[in-house]
Amino acid sequence: MTYIPTTAAEQQQMLAACGAHRMEELFSDVPASVRLGRELNLPRPMAEAEVWRHLEELAGKNKKLVSFLGAGAYEHYIPSVVGHLLARSEFYTAYTPYQPEISQGTLQAIFEFQSLICELTGLDVATASHYDGATAMAEAALVACNATRRQKILVSRSVNPQYRTVLSTYAKGQGVELAEVPLQDGRTDLEALEKLAGKDVAGVILQNPNFFGQIEAMAEATDLAHKARALGIAVVDPVSLGLLAAPGEYGADLAVGEGQSLGNPLNFGGPYLGFIAAREKLVRRLPGRIVGQTKDVDGKRAYVLTLQAREQHIRREKATSNICSNEALCALAATIYLAAMGREGLKEVASQCLLKAHYAQKKLAALPGVTPVFNGPFFHEFVLQTKLSPATVARRLAENGFAAGFDLGRFYPELKNALLFTVTEVRTREEIDALVAAMRGILA
């Protein structure tokens, strides 16, 4: 065991303390039949320079594709200041504090995150963050059930299918009934929603922009929810709020979403960042942590964890949620991103997403064999249909250096051969034109 920095004399002292003479005696209870009995078949050790060269060779095998994929996870530009500040040891190594008032810096960072989410959504209070957008939506549904004392949730079919799957998992354990609202031309059918919104409904969930990128009639849908004395729950893309109306403006009671777009890379699927914002009347029903601002005994500003109705602090059956952690580091990244971009910066990002997506949609829809599926207004995602299977299109595009065309038929059988394209501010006109040229060649 040469990798352990002990001398032979020190090893003998430790063996003597164990009542052994040789190292092998420590493993005497391991049958000989299961022992290896030979040296490990490992290559020779490498010098540091050799390791770097080997890793570069492995990295060189990766395929770098220009991405036009989205469907809930988006590639946005991240200012360098985000990574620089995030990597500071004061933040990077700190878990959510168990003696919170000692960690005033961490609590202030979370407080700033909550404040920014409230400003984005136009609502009164936000939590310290959640695991991801899907769990945030499911938790909001439980808030609606607790607040109204009803056990039925209406959720539009235009909401991200993976979010709906997580919601279904939550609902089974809580005895919550789910009903899906059908679609009309890629958006929630408001007439169907009005018929479904009865006196037993606790909440109505819509996504804006929805999974197809379409802009929903959120004000009308929220009004229908309120007529049934249910809560209106909006699932939003935070970047889109640089241009679109905030949930608070159209009367939503709760706003949830995925914060990955705010300064967090794609990370091969995680960790991501869920957020929940709500009206003040719901503050005591919110899950997880909330950081509040107060004054200490000397009258100085101080931050505390407040309203911790979590299963770790009270009787489990009385808790509002089993959520017992958050995504503080990812929330810090979102906070730094929003502070760096500012109001006008976020508006510029949203504007570029909108303009570039419409440019790409116009170019692609003009190709022979390509048909736009929906005609409503959209933000930065759109749906096109081709004569080829989505798998064929995706494979051929990958051969041309593009990751594009999410297969909607996976979740919507009626959308066979329909592809979801996403364009964010990081894509250039040249990349969009190259995608169009590649599609033209594939469909020829």
Curated annotation (Swiss-Prot):
Keywords: Oxidoreductase. Coiled coil: none annotated. SUPFAM superfamilies: PLP-dependent transferases (SSF53383). GO terms for molecular function: glycine dehydrogenase (decarboxylating) activity. It catalyses: N(6)-[(R)-lipoyl]-L-lysyl-[glycine-cleavage complex H protein] + glycine + H(+) = N(6)-[(R)-S(8)-aminomethyldihydrolipoyl]-L-lysyl-[glycine-cleavage complex H protein] + CO2. Pfam families: GDC-P. Its EC number is 1.4.4.2. The keyword Manganese does not apply. It comes from the Bacteria. It is an enzyme of class 1 (oxidoreductase). GO terms for biological process: glycine decarboxylation via glycine cleavage system; nucleoside metabolic process. NCBIfam families: PRK00451.1. The glycine cleavage system catalyzes the degradation of glycine. The P protein binds the alpha-amino group of glycine through its pyridoxal phosphate cofactor; CO(2) is released and the remaining methylamine moiety is then transferred to the lipoamide cofactor of the H protein. The glycine cleavage system is composed of four proteins: P, T, L and H. In this organism, the P 'protein' is a heterodimer of two subunits. Belongs to the GcvP family. N-terminal subunit subfamily. This is Probable glycine dehydrogenase (decarboxylating) subunit 1. The lineage of its organism: Bacteria, Bacillati, Bacillota, Clostridia, Moorellales.
